[in-house]
Amino acid sequence: MASKHNADLSSAAMLAALLLCALGAPVEYEPTDSPAGDFSGEEQEVTPDLLSASPVWDLIIGVTAHHQKEFEDEFQQEVKYRFLNHYKLSSLPADCPSANFSKEACLQRLAEGLHTYMVLFKHVEKEYPSSSILLHARYHSGALIGLIKEKMRNPGQVTVPTSRQEQQLLQDMDNPSTFHRKMTAHNILRQLHNFLRNGKVAIRKREMPKQKRRKDDGIIPPIHPSYQMT
């Protein structure tokens, strides 16, 4: 993958680390060398008691939003981004249903889904070992898992893939075709972006008072014009 956005992604990582320290949030996964770099920008108003208000969401969604640009830079219009629709994975985590699903159940699904993505990241790393998007997505995903579990009544109910399940997941994605493996890796990052955006909407709806929910259907405003996925 192209590395031209490394500086921006490193800035996002440093901002995440500072904000997490300020909020006292645990980091579920912490790499030996965490992403770092200088940062600048306006401060955001944070409401620590609401999971959906955590700045970690916008940081990781902002990072994964760079994926389409990197995909297009790599393939130079020879392969359209929508072509990834042909590389569907049955192992991709499901979103929280819009109705008849409690907040606790939604939190559990999100945490377990992110644990699954942690395994899928190993396939991405195999194909793109120097991917800065992967580096920051993995780091922020670990932080988000910790925040989600803090909000759960029974965080011990969250299941993590066993070694055997992890091996099976990675084996299912293996393919003799280099192109096929790369498309699978790209689709993982693409679907992670969607999973996170949908997850934030789902949690925001469940945290929002019913009166406010009627006025605001839980739509997240764009993080930044340059982060739009088309």
Curated annotation (Swiss-Prot):
- Composition-biased stretches, type Basic and acidic residues, lie in 206-218
Induction (UniProt) = By LPS.
Can you tell me which residues are glycosylated? 100
What Pfam families is this protein classified in?
IL6
Alphabetical list of Gene3D superfamilies matching this protein: 1.20.1250.10
Its keywords, alphabetically, are: Acute phase, Cytokine, Disulfide bond, Glycoprotein, Growth factor, Secreted, Signal
Q: Which family does it belong to?
A: Belongs to the IL-6 superfamily.
> What PANTHER family has UniProt attached to this entry?
INTERLEUKIN-6 (PTHR48494:SF1)
This chain's function reads: Cytokine with a wide variety of biological functions in immunity, tissue regeneration, and metabolism. Binds to IL6R, then the complex associates to the signaling subunit IL6ST/gp130 to trigger the intracellular IL6-signaling pathway. The interaction with the membrane-bound IL6R and IL6ST stimulates 'classic signaling', whereas the binding of IL6 and soluble IL6R to IL6ST stimulates 'trans-signaling'. Alternatively, 'cluster signaling' occurs when membrane-bound IL6:IL6R complexes on transmitter cells activate IL6ST receptors on neighboring receiver cells.
The name this protein carries in UniProt is Interleukin-6
Give the organism the record lists: Paralichthys olivaceus
Q: What is the lineage of its organism?
A: Eukaryota, Metazoa, Chordata, Craniata, Vertebrata
Q: Which gene encodes it?
A: il6
